[in-house]
Amino acid sequence: MKTALKLTVLAAALAAGAIATMPASFAQPQDVGNAVATEQRAVTAFSAIELAGPYHVVIDAQAKPSLELSGERKQLAEIETVVRGDTLVVRPVQRNGFFFNFGKRRETVTVRIGAAALKRVTVAGSGDVEIDHIKGDSFTLAGNGPGDVRASGAVRQLTVTSSGSGDLELQHLKAGDVDLTLNGPGDVELADVSGTLVVQAGGSGDLEADGLRAGKVTARMRGPGNVKLSGSARELDLEMSGSGDFEGCDLRIDGGARSVQRGPGNACLAGAIRKFDGEVDGSGELAVRGLQAGTAQLRMNGPGNVALAGTVGDLNVEVAGSGDLDAAGLKTGKATVRGRGPGGVTLANVGDTLDAALYGSGGLKASLSGKRLLLRMNGPGDARIDGTVAQVDAQITGSGSLDGHGLTAGHADIVVHGPGTASVNVVDGNDRAASKTVARGQLLLVDRSGSHTTR
């Protein structure tokens, strides 16, 4: 009898143990840890937020301070939320100095934060972040991870740093002044900047800013990322040393523009530019449209080509590289050209004076309707000049030649000391020479042996 009782007790114990070791799906109808829950967590006052982890975060910058988490209970238990100083930190629970990683989850935790006094947000996680109703004198946003950020509101001073792969969608965030730094592959979208825009672009991420009404745009581009701007700005200060392009053809510049290119990146400027200063030292090309400048200066020291269009009162050009200047669409009053390299220069509609000195192999093509042509040719480069002019003064000591078969001058003083030659049509009287309807007159041919005329 005692033996039978012992066997019965042993069988019951074994059955209980088997049940205890069965999978949870058989032991109970639902795992409490996988159930979806919502937690309200207490927070003290804060003005900054630091986010890390794969959470979907929604921030209301006009709501009273609050913190709500929604997700599976096990996930919520592994989220640390703490206020340190003035900063609310939301991140995975740390394990021995490392963040605890959940692994793959079926649902993403949603974190809702009320932050009425919000001034700064730092995003280092992979989750997406929404920030609504931003308002105040200043706001700082740092995107350091793969998570995307979308923000809306209005602020006077906006400071943005993008060093991660996440995109920053800020086109619904109005700002007066914007200071933007791009060091990573993430893209940034802006809109409606009404003050100053300062861009430091060193990464591969692109910037697109629409609807600008800026007083001044300053851009420093050192990486492969592109910058595309539209709207208007009174002033532009651009420096490029990377391979990224500056797409400013849809940005109307109403004041001064400065552009320096030292790399392969291309640039396009447009508007009603009142003053222009450009330098092209790299292989990137420059296009400037809509010039309405009193003065314009251009220095070309590299292989990059330049195209200018519009109107300039006084144009000063130095060409020392292999890049060509195409100013066929530019109307100028006075033009000064110094050619020291293989790059060629094309000018049109010079209305007053053309002062050109050619020392290199680059050629000069120009059309005149003005007072004077002052030309010095010391190299192998040729010059072809058309139109009408009152006075021609030329000195040719190199192998290059002056082709003036299409040029009519009232008076010509040409000296040739080298193997080059010169030709120009000469008529009597400065007044007649300045007329576009006057006959060509006599063709003056000059070489180092002397000069003679033909009909």
Residue ranges and their predicted role:
Residues 2-10, 19-144, 148-163, 167-183, ...:
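Acidic (Asp/Glu) and glycine-rich low-complexity loops/linkers
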Residues 12-14:
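Phosphate-group recognition and catalysis centered on beta-loop-alpha active-site segments
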Residues 358, 377:
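Short Lys/Arg-rich basic patches
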